[in-house]
Amino acid sequence: MAFESLTDKLQNVFKKLKGKGRLTEADVKVALKEVKMALLEADVNFKVVKQFTKSVQEKAIGQDVMNGLNPGQMVIKIVNDELVNLMGSETTELPIKPGMDLTVLMMVGLQGACKTTTVAKLAGKLKSKGKRPLLVACDVYRPAAITQLQVNGEKQGVEVFSMGDKQNPVDIAKAAIEHAKSNQQNVVLIDTAGRLHIDEDMMQELEDIKANVNVDATVLVVDAMTGQDAVNVAQNFSDKVGIDGVILTKMDGDTRGGAALSIKAVTGKPIFYVGMGEKLSDLEQFYPERMASRILGMGDVMSLIEKVEASVDQEQAQEMQKKLKKMDFDFNDYLTSMEQMNKMGGISSILNMLPGMGGKMKDIEGMIDEKAMDRTKSIILSMTPQERSNPNILNISRKNRIARGAGVDITEVNRLVKQFEQSKKMMKQMPGLTGGKMNMGKRGGFKLPF
């Protein structure tokens, strides 16, 4: 996950400041030297790092420690505030017009940045917000680009406008606008051609589309794993074509994350969304304050709550709560809970948003067997409806049949049954989900659906 190494190094820096009554200039300079190295190793732009550490130093030297905070926590607060400022201070929304007024988005980027997939992800996101998007296939050069967009569009339930790979992209874009107007579609997403590198032909084609179509916003899709190259690409597109903002992809990968900390400061353009996985649902709104919290190892509880709310069917949750009270929890419910967890990105995604877990994910991920969840699902699906509803009837003969059907050893079936019984006992003691909004605990906690 992005920023793991940076998070770990920053936490080590802050630990050294604990126990001091006042932050001396020497304390701050030593700490900031380590912070500077950590940021540079995370591939943050050098000029950005220099300005960042200068700003933190000016605010931290001689700073009285606030009540209830130790010096380490005080520095964390200052660093947090500066990180938020660095990434944009406030969340920037895509400039989508209200109601049925047509918005045209031109999506641009280099090959390998997952642009076409991201365009489909964005269309699904807009559809979930009540918009009627239209995907437009203007990449007529890359083999299978049109097919890829059509397949992803179908999965998202979004229409894809295509005129094949023999037409001029400008003509396709113009025809798509007329099609959208005729069919009451209010957001047009133009998937333009990517290139292996920035060239004049590519830029001219983008300029031609902008000149012939009333584009409301040009959105650059860029690969976060390319580090400083991502920032350079953003700057080049901004200078030559003009962009309104960025979507960073592959932020769930083994990336140092420097692009997220540099793009706004270098280009002046905001980050709209970040791609956090391969699924079409893995596109998250970019919140500078939440990203700063993740970087500092303080988690992102608000995003987790939103994921839970979006993934859990409230009627289903109420029904499960009733079952738990009656101790009527069965394998159907167990399977539902697993599917809900999967919708939220899996165990690793959930843990990464919890406070204190940021710098520990490398160790924890080695202990998590995501494939075990797939095997568990296979075992449950190999049961008959009667067996899922009445786990008590699972004798040795039935378990052997289930193991053969799932392609696993019977020991895995026995292990699952044992885990199920343990979970059933624990569930009785866990507060359930209430109707409407998610049930918030006394300390701002929340109730997960499993």
Predicted feature descriptions by range:
Residues L6, N12-C138, A145-D165, A173-T192:
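Primarily NTPase-proximal linker/entry elements flanking Walker-type ATP/GTP-binding cores
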Residues K129-L134, Q156-V160, V188, V213-T218, ...:
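Short, surface-exposed connector motifs at secondary-structure boundaries
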Residues A173-I177, K181, Q185, H197, ...:
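Conserved phosphate-handling catalytic cores of large alpha/beta enzymes
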